[in-house]
Each structure stands twice: as structure tokens, then as C-alpha cells.
């Protein structure tokens, strides 16, 4: 038994040495990486509308384009509440398809939350549900904030992501 282990030991050492010396692929980078870019909303559809306690409650479908670290198309369904004082709160889920930073290409689900007014909102989105992701070669996790105009549909985003 000792002879078998000793015969394999040099090969194991050589493989470990190569793993340390050779750089890994870009998608295997450890730690958070910066994310930034722009969003353009190209379509907004009101799926349903109701009222409760002076609030207007909307279910909306939003589609658009992302450019930058995350590059491609997105579609999301949001629950938006317009409060009597004019402020807006929003929560929803969506799917981003295209380039997902250095993690690869494919589709990844995300959740979104935002608040603001009828003219401008700020919020955050986060890629979730890795089992539903089709990104290759690796999956993605992120925490990204955004701000922009609901009038023009133009937003900017910044944050971090890492490949899992």
C-alpha cells in the first residue's frame, strides 16, 4: 500500500504545482467584481390595476435593454403601489438574457425593489435562483443599485457581482 501511495505522490505534487502556477479563466475570478452600465426601458404594459386605502396598485410588465457589465435584454413583472402622497414603491422579478459580466452568457433570474416618485426612482436588483440560470460557464450572484427617470426610461446601475 505504501508503495502505491509513494508512486502517485510525485504526480499529485506536479498537478498541485501547475494549478498554482497557471492562471485560471476570467470567470473563475475570486471575490466581488465591479458592475456598471445603463438601462433603457423600451416597453411598459399595465397588466392589472386596483385601488385600496387611497393607493393605486398596478401589476406591470417592463421590457428593455441593459448595456455595460450586464448586456442584453430583460423582462420583468412588477407590483407597483402609487401612494396618495405621490410616492411609489415597487417589487418584482425578472429575467436578464445576454452577457453576464465575466461569468458568461445566458439567462439569469433577478429580484428588484425600488422607491421614488412618478418622475424618478432608485432601487436595487439582485440575481437569484441559480438553479434557473442558464449562464455558462458559471452562475452569477450580484447586488446592484440603480437610479433613473421613469419619464425617459433611462437608468444607470452600479454594484458588484461574482461568479459562482
Question: What label would you give each PLM region?
Answer:
Residues 2-13:
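Bacterial N-terminal signal peptides that target proteins for export
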Residues 7, 20-22, 29:
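Compositionally biased, intrinsically disordered/low-complexity regions enriched for serine, proline
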Residues 11, 24-26, 33-35:
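Generic low-complexity segments that are intrinsically disordered, proline-rich and/or Lys/Arg-biased
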Residues 13-23:
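Bacterial N-terminal signal peptides
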Residues 29-164:
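Beta-strand-enriched cores of mature, soluble protein domains
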Amino acid at each position: 500500500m505504501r508503495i502505491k501511495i509513494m508512486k502517485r505522490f510525485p504526480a499529485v505534487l506536479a498537478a498541485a504545482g501547475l494549478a498554482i502556477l497557471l492562471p485560471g479563466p476570467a470567470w473563475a475570478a475570486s471575490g466581488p467584481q465591479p458592475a456598471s452600465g445603463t438601462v433603457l426601458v423600451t416597453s411598459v404594459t399595465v397588466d392589472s390595476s386596483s385601488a385600496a386605502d387611497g393607493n393605486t396598485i398596478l401589476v406591470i410588465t417592463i421590457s428593455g435593454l441593459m448595456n455595460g457589465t450586464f448586456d442584453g435584454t430583460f423582462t420583468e413583472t412588477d407590483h407597483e403601489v402609487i401612494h396618495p402622497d405621490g410616492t411609489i414603491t415597487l417589487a418584482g422579478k425578472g429575467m436578464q438574457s445576454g452577457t453576464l459580466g465575466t461569468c458568461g452568457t445566458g439567462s439569469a433570474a433577478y429580484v428588484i425593489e425600488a422607491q421614488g416618485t412618478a418622475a424618478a426612482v432608485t432601487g436595487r436588483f439582485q440575481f437569484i435562483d441559480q438553479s434557473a440560470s442558464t449562464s455558462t460557464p458559471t452562475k452569477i450572484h450580484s447586488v446592484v443599485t440603480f437610479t433613473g427617470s421613469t419619464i425617459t426610461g433611462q437608468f444607470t446601475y452600479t454594484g458588484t457581482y461574482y461568479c459562482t
